[in-house]
Amino acid sequence: MSEILSSLRSLMASHSPPLDALVVPSEDYHQSEYVSARDKRREFVSGFSGSAGLALITKKEARLWTDGRYFLQALQQLSDEWTLMRMGEDPLVEVWMSDNLPEEANIGVDSWCVSVDTANRWGKSFAKKNQKLITTTTDLVDEVWKSRPPSEMSPVVVHPLEFAGRSVSHKFEDLRAKLKQEGARGLVIAALDEVAWLYNIRGTDVAYCPVVHAFAILTTDSAFLYVDKKKVSDEANSYFNGLGVEVREYTDVISDVALLASDRLISSFASKTVQHEAAKDMEIDSDQPDRLWVDPASCCYALYSKLDAEKVLLQPSPISLSKALKNPVELEGIKNAHVRDGAAVVQYLVWLDNQMQELYGASGYFLEAEASKKKPSETSKLTEVTVSDKLESLRASKEHFRGLSFPTISSVGSNAAVIHYSPEPEACAEMDPDKIYLCDSGAQYLDGTTDITRTVHFGKPSAHEKECYTAVFKGHVALGNARFPKGTNGYTLDILARAPLWKYGLDYRHGTGHGVGSYLCVHEGPHQVSFRPSARNVPLQATMTVTDEPGYYEDGNFGIRLENVLVVNDAETEFNFGDKGYLQFEHITWAPYQVKLIDLDELTREEIDWLNTYHSKCKDILAPFMNQTEMEWLKKATEPVSVSA
């Protein structure tokens, strides 16, 4: 690591102008949360592998900012050369730089890896001390990274209409209407999942998220896709030709954005497409007829710098909300995917319960007793990785399976307190029947993306562990049972999941819920359920998906999280105050909760009824996928409970 920092500091000194500091973001050219191996620059320089974070290298210091999900992981992975900066507790990176770097300091960042929003915010902060943000045109990290992985060459795959549910031409029509409404003549699309959604295409360029490295531009009469043409088969080319989409090289996007700015970007299909004929009838609002729509959160500064800032509409992409509002076909597919996925999770729990009893002498999923301290042989012992591999194999046997939706968080004991723990084969823990086991996992299916967390104990949980699990469960149920007026955002609802924990002075450092894509990214906006102010931006709306995942974590001891995916539906209420209309949630995740971890005396009658109803549905819905042994286990796991049980 010292050699990497030393090499970067040499490049910083020789840069023109010389750099006093270098920022290395987590994001790629598309501001993605999950990036390809080739784009993990921040991980390369720091050794920290979490999905969120930012590295800052000065002449004498190296600091890494990350959020509460990764505090423990960062402490474990960072060398002594690095200082951990805790987001939400320590100063923001721009505040720290403004306060600690000298006046007129030059602060460098790759202009392709920083968003318009971030670059503008930093620029304003630095101006207080005449500091300058230097957006470099080449990435200094790439010059140091001699073993950088090659570019991904996975093919562009057309996503069938039977799963997408809405044609590209209809999406074009909707978006062009929004362009007209905003007085814009074009939209620059940088987010990978937005490009995939708009053109009904998928790929495997990024692990766990079925997207292709590509940009897009949509105007009132043309459509462009910027992708490495070697990824586009003859069949895919025919598909794009039929849509009137011009395919250009990935690297052409920056010159074409400059052409777009001067209204000189012309498609060879422009005069042939139905979209063009429709566009001739569209009258752009005369007061601002020349604006270009750019999402400041997903568009990189490199592209934005080619535009006339006076003629740019900086606001969230219209695709983000359209993608979040699932069509009927997507909703049906997501629900079906969660049924198959739930079956795999239950089959996994049945297998794991049997293995823990057989190999470790555990009392098992249903009984409370300390293990007999039986030890398996070296070849038969279970680890966090070997058991998660079993779960993946069970998922892989299900129809339409295409891979995992994120690295499985298979965590025992103190590892479960690391919120986004990722076990490695060489350095993972062995399963322990006397410790809590947390498994947060998900999969990609052609008809939907899944995300589920269950926490279990195969021995005798302590009273404190039960107390904490029960509080998490009560918050999970409270949020899932909420009814609320239309226009309500996730910031308002977040307290429902935390209140039972707050009663004991407990809390958790992550958000409570995120949107889930339709065979796309497992983390999807623009909505969320969270304590963070950004959760105020977009209200929850019918047909959105959102997770319900409160938790509690004790460093060095254990972690608990429960997670289901919910669909937002219209609610039938007795009254309709303010004529707003009301919404409610529908659970679409199916796997039992471990009753022996719940203090039933702490549950209300409503919570008991909800648990019994959910378990009854769970049993009936998953029954067709179970063999006799699995069905017997599931029946036992979903038996009705009462306060006196």
Swiss-Prot record:
Residues bound to a peptide: 69, 420, 514, 523, 549
Cofactor descriptive note: Binds 2 manganese or zinc ions per subunit.
Cofactor needs: Mn(2+); Zn(2+)
EC number: 3.4.11.9
PTM field: Glycosylated. Also present in a non-glycosylated form.
GO biological process, one term: auxin polar transport
InterPro entries xrefs: Creatin/AminoP/Spt16_N (IPR029149), Creatinase/aminopeptidase-like (IPR036005), Creatinase_N (IPR000587), Pept_M24 (IPR000994), Pept_M24B (IPR033740), Peptidase_M24_C (IPR032416), Peptidase_M24B_aminopep-P_CS (IPR001131), X-Pro_aminopeptidase_P (IPR050422)
Predominant localisation class: cytoplasm
PROSITE patterns per the UniProt record, alphabetical: PROLINE_PEPTIDASE (PS00491)
Residues reported to bind Mn(2+) 2: 451, 514, 549, 563
Top EC category: hydrolase
Modification N-acetylserine, positions: 2
One GO MF term: zinc ion binding
Membrane topology: Peripheral membrane protein
Keyword tags: Acetylation, Aminopeptidase, Cell membrane, Cytoplasm, Endoplasmic reticulum, Glycoprotein, Hydrolase, Manganese, Membrane, Metal-binding, Metalloprotease, Microsome, Protease
Pfam families from the UniProt entry: Creatinase_N, Creatinase_N_2, Peptidase_M24, Peptidase_M24_C
Residues that, per the record, bind Mn(2+) 1: 440, 451, 563
Subcellular localization, as worded in the UniProt entry: Cytoplasm; Cell membrane; Microsome membrane
Free-text activity regulation comment from the record: Inhibited by EGTA and apstatin, and, to some extent, by the flavonoid kaempferol.
Swiss-Prot/TrEMBL catalytic activity: Release of any N-terminal amino acid, including proline, that is linked to proline, even from a dipeptide or tripeptide
Family that this chain belongs to: Belongs to the peptidase M24B family.
Role this protein plays: Catalyzes the removal of a penultimate prolyl residue from the N-termini of peptides, such as Arg-Pro-Pro. Aminopeptidase that binds to the auxin transport inhibitor N-1-naphthylphthalamic acid (NPA). May play a negative role in the regulation of PIN auxin transport proteins.
Subunit organization: Homodimer. Interacts with N-1-naphthylphthalamic acid (NPA).
Name this protein carries in UniProt: Aminopeptidase P1
Gene: APP1
